[in-house]
């Protein structure tokens, strides 16, 4: 049986969540760890943008976004019922995480002005507090 091929980068948060969903769903893949400085031509052959993660399915279908890879994997097998409540709520949380929170996190991580580190950390912490409160009832 031919396995899907996952192009990934170890530290990319989007690739990490794609790998997590594939692992959770029990989907075996061939992992192609790439160097961001030297991306392979076969990655560009299936995905013009050349970013990770990219999942190439045995039937030739290419999934180029981490969220789409996650949803595909969980649709194959959701043994612990991760998608048990309103999918729109979950997708909204992911959208907020990928836009607003990620921007503040990057500002904090890559900020070169020490004087506003606390302010930037506070912006990130607000999102984390919201996530934690919404998860409390499930823990």
List the predicted regions and their residue ranges:
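GST-like domain detector, emphasizing the conserved glutathione-binding G-site
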Residues: 1-129, 134-139
């Amino acid at each position: 049986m031919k396995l899907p091929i996952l192009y990934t980068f170890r530290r990319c948060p989007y690739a990490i969540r794609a790998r997590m969903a594939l692992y959770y769903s029990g989907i075996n893949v061939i992992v192609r760890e790439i160097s961001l400085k030297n991306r392979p031509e076969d990655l560009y052959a299936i995905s013009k943008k050349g970013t990770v993660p990219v999942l190439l399915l045995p039937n030739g279908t290419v999934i180029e976004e981490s969220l789409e890879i996650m949803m595909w994997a969980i649709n194959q097998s959701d043994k612990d019922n991760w998608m048990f409540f309103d999918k729109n709520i979950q997708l909204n949380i992911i959208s907020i995480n990928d836009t607003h929170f990620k921007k503040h996190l990057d500002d904090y991580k890559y900020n070169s002005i020490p004087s506003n580190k606390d302010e930037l950390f506070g912006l990130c912490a607000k999102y984390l507090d919201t996530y934690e409160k919404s998860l409390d009832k499930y823990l």
